[in-house]
Amino acid sequence: MLKLFAKYTSIGVLNTLIHWGVFAFCVYGMHTHQALANFSGFVIAVSFSFYANARFTFNATTTTLRYMMYVGFMGTLSAVVGWMADQCSLPPLITLITFSAISLVCGFIYSRFIVFRDIR
């Protein structure tokens, strides 16, 4: 399990760079609300994360159902964190750090035990 989490974390670093880049562009370049910026960053980064983790972490085939399950769960998590950040007037950097930490742990657990549960 630790080896899987290490692989998931490695892909998560790349995913985080993608997410944070899009988030920064939306907040600072387009002046959007954090909820929209966080969700936009998520949408772009989640596809990379799903396919990379399916292939390199879980050695699994990708299916539309698995993709929809992963995107649905992680998208809801992203929107909730962004909405809460707006409600609390959190600085964007705190929002990014918070979402990155929550999504790493929750995403791994959800992927391992729900999305790719029949693998390995």
From Swiss-Prot:
Keyword Nucleotidyltransferase on entry: no
Electron transport listed as a keyword: no
Coiled-coil features, chain-numbered ranges: none
Transmembrane segments: 10-30, 34-54, 65-85, 90-110
Cellular compartment(s): Host membrane
Superkingdom, taxonomy of origin: Viruses
Membrane-related topology note: Multi-pass membrane protein
Keyword set, alphabetical order: Host membrane, Membrane, Transmembrane, Transmembrane helix, Transport
Gene Ontology CC: host cell membrane; plasma membrane
Gene Ontology biological process terms, A to Z: polysaccharide biosynthetic process
Main location: host cell
Family: Belongs to the GtrA family.
Function comment: Involved in O antigen modification. Involved in the translocation of bactoprenol-linked glucose across the cytoplasmic membrane.
Name the record gives this protein: Bactoprenol-linked glucose translocase
Species of origin: Salmonella phage P22
